[in-house]
């Protein structure tokens, strides 16, 4: 059994909390894409655990965790994050964590060139805007992967005669191509191979053939949960390109990032924030550059876990959610942070786009069009009630249930979970048929 948790908007929907809620039922939690460019916080028994690269399943002491071949790994950050989690009391984490031998490596020079590229792009653009990269080197690493010049985990940990010398030579060639592209930037080449020679010994115990790992688990009928990174609207193919990440963050990335066939997937859970947020640049049709946006930002504490940047805020965009649903095929939804809307008298939701008076059939691929659309809103009544203490779905205010029902009817997918606060237990479950 393979179930999948995916973000349906622009990220930061609260995927980690749902994974944390579900993880006790699973034998394995796997990540399939991205790197340490995303982040979420899980609170267990009053202890906050910040996850960036590592799977959230580590909070369950009986769960194995895998970083799949689609993940890109900055090895120093891998160990720093692991040590930080261990210092907070995470038990037997090292014996439960595995890394695909096919995963690509992020180096420090990828991070340097990531920032240089961002500056270059902002200088070229007419409006001075940039992509909004986290500067973690994710894009440049996927770029070297696509150009077939990247280095993978197995290149680093290979013990065969001459393998280390080959690794250093390829590393040097990769660095030189970056210097040819961006000029002579500050970088201590002599120190880095020595650092990685130490890290390779530390990394070896974690490395597995992830294809064998996953298929053995499937054959053994293990319960597997895939933890998506980022979200569909940041997908390299289906997101608001070029204001996207560099990997496939939808259902397609699950298959290619873990090497599993489509028939193995059972449930696909779409995580949806009750309003909409976005970090970085790019079109955002329902953004509220007013007191409503500020109120959502303040009440929702909308700051990025990885970057600390303020998130842009706006009303729920059902055009986005319907588009996301078409691609990912959600079987049920988790609506998060519903409590942030508690004090709004009226709650608009975006239900269609038009441009120059002509209604669009679906979410447009052209950002020149998307940036000019007019949003039609359906205004729903608020509930003006604190819902953070409610423990059963049935006890939600009628207007809150009507809000959720409107979402269900619009996208044609049932709501199964509702987040009503930051605490681990603040998640209501609704039985679905």
Curated annotation (Swiss-Prot):
Q: Which gene encodes it?
A: ADE12
Q: Which GO terms describe its molecular function?
A: adenylosuccinate synthase activity; GTP binding; magnesium ion binding
Grouped into one coarse class, the protein's main location is cytoplasm
What is the scientific name of the source organism?
Saccharomyces cerevisiae (strain Lalvin EC1118 / Prise de mousse)
The record's Gene Ontology biological-process terms are: 'de novo' AMP biosynthetic process; IMP metabolic process
> Which key words are in the record?
Cytoplasm, GTP-binding, Ligase, Magnesium, Metal-binding, Nucleotide-binding, Purine biosynthesis
- Write out the residues that bind GTP: 11-17, 39-41, 311, 337-339, 419-421
Q: Which residues cross the membrane?
A: none
Q: Which residues bind IMP?
A: 12-15, 37-40, 134, 148, 230, 245, 309
Q: What is its EC number?
A: 6.3.4.4
Reaction catalysed by this chain? IMP + L-aspartate + GTP = N(6)-(1,2-dicarboxyethyl)-AMP + GDP + phosphate + 2 H(+)
Taxonomy of the source species: Eukaryota, Fungi, Dikarya, Ascomycota, Saccharomycotina
Looking up InterPro entries in the UniProt record yields: Adenylosuccin_syn_GTP-bd, Adenylosuccin_syn_Lys_AS, Adenylosuccinate_synth_dom1, Adenylosuccinate_synth_dom2, Adenylosuccinate_synth_dom3, Adenylosuccinate_synthetase, P-loop_NTPase
Similarity annotation = Belongs to the adenylosuccinate synthetase family.
Top-level lineage group: Eukaryota
* Protein's UniProt name: Adenylosuccinate synthetase
Q: Where does Mg(2+) bind?
A: 12, 39
Active site (catalytic residues): 12, 40
SMART domains xref list: Adenylsucc_synt
Q: In which pathway does it act?
A: Purine metabolism; AMP biosynthesis via de novo pathway; AMP from IMP: step 1/2
Give the cofactors, semicolon-separated.
Answer: Mg(2+)
Q: Where in the cell is it found?
A: Cytoplasm
Annotated residues for binding of substrate: 305-311
Q: What's its job?
A: Plays an important role in the de novo pathway and in the salvage pathway of purine nucleotide biosynthesis. Catalyzes the first committed step in the biosynthesis of AMP from IMP.
How does it associate, per the subunit comment? Homodimer.
